[in-house]
Amino acid sequence: MVRNVDDLDFHLPSHAQDMLDGLQRLRSQPKLADVTLLVGGRELPCHRGLLALSSPYFHAMFAGDFAESFSARVELRDVEPAVVGQLVDFVYTGRLTITQGNVEALTRTAARLHFPSVQKVCGRYLQQQLDAANCLGICEFGEQQGLLGVAAKAWAFLRENFEAVAREDEFLQLPRERLVTCLAGDLLQVQPEQSRLEALMRWVRHDPQARAAHLPELLSLVHLDAVPRPCVQQLLASEPLIQESEACRAALSQGHDGAPLALQQKLEEVLVVVGGQALEEEEAGEEPTPGLGNFAFYNSKAKRWMALPDFPDYHKWGFSLAALNNNIYVTGGSRGTKTDTWSTTQAWCFPLKEASWKPVAPMLKPRTNHASAALNGEIYVIGGTTLDVVEVESYDPYTDSWTPVSPALKYVSNFSAAGCRGRLYLVGSSACKYNALALQCYNPVTDAWSVIASPFLPKYLSSPRCAALHGELYLIGDNTKKVYVYDPGANLWQKVQSQHSLHENGALVPLGDALYVTGGRWQGMEGDYHVEMEAYDTVRDTWTRHGALPRLWLYHGASTVFLDVSKWTQPSGPTQEH
């Protein structure tokens, strides 16, 4: 057909939504609905075409050669009427309210009737609700319902928060097999080891008649040589469950005396740093070379830097580092020379258990000078692309895949991000000098951002860095020694004790109950470059200097993990200042 210059292509933007709204209204007129679902005595008029589009279960039912394919009334058994009603409403409106009271029923019914989008959002909701009181139950529920990603993230939460979980009632109800799995975890992050011993004793005391026989086996899972001697002596002297068992007495005595038990690992929380180009390399105009060491950890107890296996991509800057499930992830960054650079989509992982770097699935977009943060069992990367929008994506380590996330509402290019209280917080401004900071918050359950108007938010910070500790968000910049803390519950910022020094191109990370700041600074008329570190005691509101980083890194990323410090004996540094 020949088009005429007067032809008009008309598009009604609201047409699709109008049709859905109209079909929803037609449900109240049974004559205009072509199928009625019968659920526990409740009748739900609807349209089989919409059900088939929303659910493979209904598509197979209505498109196949079954009695239901031709029947005007279809009965669904062994499902809750109210929940099916919610799912049918979702088909017509795209809206669903998930609560702690209905999430399990919704998950089960969505799995039964094959509503994949509902299963996915219920899984995200469960991850959002993870805490010490429910993580064991959510882990078991996830395994039962085939939500293996949810189960994996609940298991990771247990590993990272074992001491808190062990104090909850759910822990006391664990079957023996499950408890053994918990205690035997190679990466169970327990400090001190006494906590593991106290947890198993609490479990046995909850039902001593049935559980006392398992005590010798459970004791073999504890690093008894790391338990303080007074604790062991007290158990031997006053605990009936120990006194009545020769095997238990022998295990405690033998383990603490260092008799022929195998040497077991002792995990300690340490600060890890991956360095980019260093000052000496820039001055020489050279590419970084292997052998200089670009990956190290700081043992805050011994106050020493020790070398780790080098990050294999030496000539890179603008990358971001985050830790998740006690694994270290490095994403993005730029490669090439100063005059010819390009961003990468590369992502690397350093699993502590394997102790070597390996590539993981590449990001969907190349990113440089972006932020990354762990939240609810996933890694989020924020910004760093070439568009004038803050593009976001998330990485699921269970599926080794990246998923696009809603972009931030307000564009920022001078920013930092951190996960806190189940939300992702983005603090930043545009690159324009003295452009005011904005605070944005992302809810992973609804995949939605909001801009938070918060009193006393600092007006401007150059290269802001933020980190979460004890449910609060700490914020610093490289143009000031001032330190700010944000309480999300009260929506209030306040100042705390200032740092001793300025820190450029560094990181702010929580380690135990303290915050560590790393980064360099130029000092003196000749422009000497120093890379210093200091720690903030949140209880005493004081800063303490911790010396230099191993090398004069102009760019680096940092985080914290738990590792067996006895396995790493090669020193890293000390730095020779210029």
UniProtKB/Swiss-Prot annotation:
CDD domains: BACK_KLHL30
Domain BTB: residue ranges: 33-100
Domain BACK, first and last residues per copy: 153-255
Coiled coil: none
InterPro entries: BACK (IPR011705), BTB-kelch_protein (IPR017096), BTB/POZ_dom (IPR000210), Kelch-typ_b-propeller (IPR015915), Kelch_1 (IPR006652), KLHL30_BACK (IPR030582), SKP1/BTB/POZ_sf (IPR011333)
GO terms, biological process: proteasome-mediated ubiquitin-dependent protein catabolic process
Alphabetic keyword roster: Kelch repeat, Repeat
Kelch repeats: 270-326, 327-377, 378-422, 424-471, 473-513, 514-563
Pfam families: BACK, BTB, Kelch_KLHDC2_KLHL20_DRC7
GO cellular component, one term: Cul3-RING ubiquitin ligase complex
Protein name: Kelch-like protein 30
